[in-house]
């Protein structure tokens, strides 16, 4: 594991230096935090207008501003690669609301993938590829709407209808 950690740290250092040197948007950037160990699935949590909870997942909660659907169970990985899987009702699903993608305190900051606003229990389900793709698309659409001065409600409706 130590060798992997060294390789990963080197990769992060090289990539950040490349971006700072070659991409104007990163000119004054810096790396503030990386995972403390190789294989860590979660870390610092973003705080959005809504916090997706473990209860939302297990109760298959639906939202009027839903931008993603998931039927993936909560999978919590422990030591020695042991996993505890908690399932919810068969043939049901939960939804991720748009509020999980927009910062609570910065109006033009949006989240996607493993960075959505959620508890540790909720992200143990929502960090899978399908949700990452759906939230990435929706977050980009919401950010574009913000930049164009459109309402977030209209952006969410357009995402829901596949119009963006």
Language-model segment annotations:
Residues 1-164:
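Flavin (FAD/FMN)-binding glycine-rich loop and adjacent Rossmann-like elements that form
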């Amino acid at each position: 594991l130590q060798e992997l950690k060294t390789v990963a740290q080197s990769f992060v250092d090289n990539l950040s230096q490349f971006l700072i040197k070659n991409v104007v948007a990163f000119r004054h950037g810096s790396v503030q935090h990386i995972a403390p160990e190789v294989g860590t699935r979660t870390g610092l949590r973003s705080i959005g207008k809504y916090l997706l909870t473990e209860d939302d997942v297990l109760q298959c909660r639906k939202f009027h501003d839903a931008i993603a659907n998931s039927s993936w169970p909560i999978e919590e990985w422990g030591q020695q690669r042991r996993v505890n899987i908690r399932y919810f009702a068969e043939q049901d699903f939960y939804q991720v609301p748009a509020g999980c993608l927009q910062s609570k305190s910065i109006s033009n900051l949006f989240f996607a993938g493993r960075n959505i606003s959620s508890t540790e229990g909720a992200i143990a389900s929502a960090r899978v590829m399908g949700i990452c793709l759906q939230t990435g698309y929706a977050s980009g659409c919401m950010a574009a709407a913000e930049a164009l001065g459109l309402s977030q409600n209209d952006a969410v409706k357009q995402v829901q209808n596949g119009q963006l």
